[in-house]
Amino acid sequence: MGNVYNREFQEMLIDHADKSADRIIPFVYDLFTPNSVVDFGCGTGNFLATVKKYSNNKCEVLGLDGNYIEKDLLQINFEKEFMSVDLTATIALEHKYEMAFSLEVGEHLDEKYADIFVDSITRASDIVLFSAALPGQYGVHHVNERYISYWIEKFSDRQYQCFDIMRPHFWWDHDIDLDYRQNMMIFVKQNADGVNEALVGKLRSLETHIYDIAH
């Protein structure tokens, strides 16, 4: 699997993610103001690097991905902020994070690992920014393209509520890569510590309920 995600692929990630992260992170950070973020399948770490920049380095970050990530392309500190992992295996971190990201990663893992992957994410945080490729989106090693309702059901089984607030806000923002703006969702664990009713009410006021749509 590492050979699939070669240097050329990782350079492409930088091109796709940088501009998108600059648009997405301010919205997400201002809404949740997390003090710590973990990214499952961080790639070259662009989203976490933008979190650090936007928070003036006040937010702790950890990027998780395979051992094929090129050290010189990584946008976060390789020694302190990156951990090489197998995303198809159970991942247990030293502590919970205030927010977890997983952006355009789930489609790269065989369907038999989907529940393990979601378990790892939900074990790590009560608030999740998630996106995964839709059927027909295609890409390098896309082996489990699914409509968003598939992932909503998996998070719901773990008592996470879906808030469709990202797509209405960014749907027509052409500074953001299409994959992100048509697939991003927020998931919040029900009755979680630190998730107050005011926040839930705000999320509900921003969301839609039309899940399985695409550009």
Model-derived regions, located:
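Conserved N-terminal segment of class I S-adenosyl-L-methionine
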Residues: 1-101, 112-124, 138, 142-150, ...
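Conserved beta-strand signature within the Rossmann-like core of class I S-adenosyl-L-methionine
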Residues: 125-135
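Hydrophobic adenine-recognition pocket in adenosine-nucleotide-binding enzymes
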Residues: 105
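A short His-aromatic
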Residues: 108-109
